[in-house]
């Protein structure tokens, strides 16, 4: 199990109104497990949630929560679905990557979410504005625009006509693994480049820190050194990680309810392991449940 730390002071009753979820690759399932267990224990309630902030896989997790499915349905979706058919990796994938600017593209990614939208009678082309009108929850998604090299926050307020699927994909487009999304002359990649954990955005928007529940994944500083056996992905990963370290230097606000997950860096191998192993996916979810249970004991 991953090491965790927590910052908690307040006793029950809890009044969580805002949820912030960082990037974290395959650890998105751990974050899902945390939120699932937190809901089961009454730490947060759907009817109280006003806004959600997500970066990269965190934006995916936020959308999953906003759609308000039964947890059993989501468990089956994550564990039983044949993810290896969505992320099929073979020689064709490698050859296609050079032309497509990434191993996988939005077609692969849309497969992850369209069934969940359709299951709630939402069109697959639903916009951020349309999602807000149905759910009443503000969803803020970070992405990195590389043409102007700046952080972009997508929401129904600033980008109402963006498709939800485009916004989530733009936030999750880790270079090399996913091709970037290009719209109106702008190129969008993973939101973690400039804002791996959008906690400060929530506070800047006026969220009461005592009403924010933050889930943050921090990667180990240990990395395999580059050598003659290193792959193109290894090199790009080092560049991205160093860039993220350089750009994510603004001190984070302090909140009472925060869980920090310590784990490995997002890797191609980790994504493949996630997509091909039911046991791995179930393990990540159960770890999230255990992490929140330990966190919750500190509140009582």
Describe these PLM feature segments.
Residues 1-55, 63-300:
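Patatin-like phospholipase
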């Amino acid at each position: 199990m991953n090491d965790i730390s927590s910052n908690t002071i307040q006793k029950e009753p809890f009044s969580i109104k805002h949820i912030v979820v960082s990037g974290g690759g395959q650890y998105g399932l751990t974050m899902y497990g945390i939120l699932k267990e937190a809901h089961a224990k009454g730490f947060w309630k759907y009817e109280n949630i006003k806004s959600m902030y997500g970066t990269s896989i965190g934006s995916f997790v936020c959308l999953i929560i906003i759609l308000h499915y039964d947890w059993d349905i989501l468990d089956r979706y994550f564990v039983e679905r044949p993810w290896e058919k969505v992320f099929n990796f073979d020689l064709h994938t490698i050859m296609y990557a050079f032309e497509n600017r990434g191993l996988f593209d939005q077609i692969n990614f849309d497969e992850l979410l369209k069934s969940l939208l359709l299951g709630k009678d939402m069109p697959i082309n639903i916009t951020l504005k349309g999602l807000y009108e149905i759910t009443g929850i503000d969803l803020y998604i970070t992405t990195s625009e590389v043409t102007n090299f700046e952080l972009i926050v997508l929401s129904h307020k600033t980008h109402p006509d963006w498709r939800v699927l485009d916004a989530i994909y733009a936030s999750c487009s880790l270079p090399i693994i996913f091709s970037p999304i290009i719209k109106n002359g702008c190129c969008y990649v993973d939101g973690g480049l400039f804002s791996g954990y959008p906690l400060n955005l929530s506070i800047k928007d006026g969220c009461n820190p005592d009403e924010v529940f933050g889930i943050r994944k921090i990667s180990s500083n240990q990395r395999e050194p580059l050598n003659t056996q290193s792959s193109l992905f290894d090199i790009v990963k080092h560049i991205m990680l160093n860039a993220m370290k350089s750009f994510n230097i603004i001190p984070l606000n302090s909140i009472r309810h925060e869980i920090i997950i310590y784990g490995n860096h997002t890797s191609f191998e980790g994504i493949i392991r996630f997509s091909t192993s039911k046991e791995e996916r179930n393990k990540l979810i159960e770890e999230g449940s255990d992490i929140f249970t330990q966190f919750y004991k500190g509140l009582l």
